[in-house]
Amino acid sequence: MEVDSKKSSDVVTKLPQKRFYRQRAHSNPIADHSFQYPAHPDEYEWSQHYPDIGDRRVAFADIGCGYGGFLVTLGEIYPDKFAVGMEIRVKVSDYVMDRIDALRKLHEGQYRNVACIRTNAMKYLTNFFHKAQLEKMFFLYPDPHFKKAKHKWRIINSALLSEYSYVLRKGGLIYTVTDVRDLHEWMCKHIEQHPAFERLSEAEVEADILSEKLLDSSEEGKKVTRNKGDKFVAIFRRV
């Protein structure tokens, strides 16, 4: 996407630099953070994030969106769909918000379909989304919580899967990616055991337009690539 030279000379907007938004890799999802959230999805003013949303609803949710690389890619691939990133870390969510704001100024009329909200998706997901609202949910490189005592904090678990099945429409998809084999096996086991989901075949995964983007669009994915790490992908359908 090229920016008109005259227009770019008149605009001093620059993309934010991550080095000014550094924060620890993960945040405790059980801690008592201070969040603002609606009592019901109808009470949330989505227009504050999406100027053109009108009566439409968000279709994609990137849970733990990190620095927003994949979220921005979603906005480019699906210009007619609204995607939200949910991030618990304050500095990281600030970066994504500033990044989207800068992209909108640099590319007039674009990136108006993506936004980031600082919240705890493990606690407040159903406060933001109606039943059967979402078409896709993404869990890219989530915190592995290696210690067994902290496995209950993992973003994929039996209790939370019931909430995900509630906000996902029939035929909707859950995408998971991690560089930790143990976490990959954990997520697959729990999702496959849940009666509301079925795993896509390898052929279906390969045919999905987002499969390649899942691996390297996010900043974490690029880091894993640089370090020559493994990447484990699985996609599940809401039945």
UniProtKB/Swiss-Prot annotation:
The keyword tRNA-binding belongs to this UniProt entry's keyword annotation: yes
PROSITE patterns found in the cross-reference section: SAM_MT_TRMB
Molecular functions per Gene Ontology: tRNA (guanine(46)-N7)-methyltransferase activity; tRNA binding
Pathway the protein acts in: tRNA modification; N(7)-methylguanine-tRNA biosynthesis
Main location class: nucleus
Keywords: Methyltransferase, Nucleus, RNA-binding, S-adenosyl-L-methionine, Transferase, tRNA processing, tRNA-binding
Active-site residues, record numbering mapped to chain: D143
Binding site for S-adenosyl-L-methionine: G64, E87, I88, N120, A121, L140, S218, E219, E220
Subcellular compartments: Nucleus
Catalytic activity line of the entry: guanosine(46) in tRNA + S-adenosyl-L-methionine = N(7)-methylguanosine(46) in tRNA + S-adenosyl-L-homocysteine
Pfam families: Methyltransf_4
Domain of life per record: Eukaryota
Family note: Belongs to the class I-like SAM-binding methyltransferase superfamily. TrmB family.
This protein's name: tRNA (guanine-N(7)-)-methyltransferase
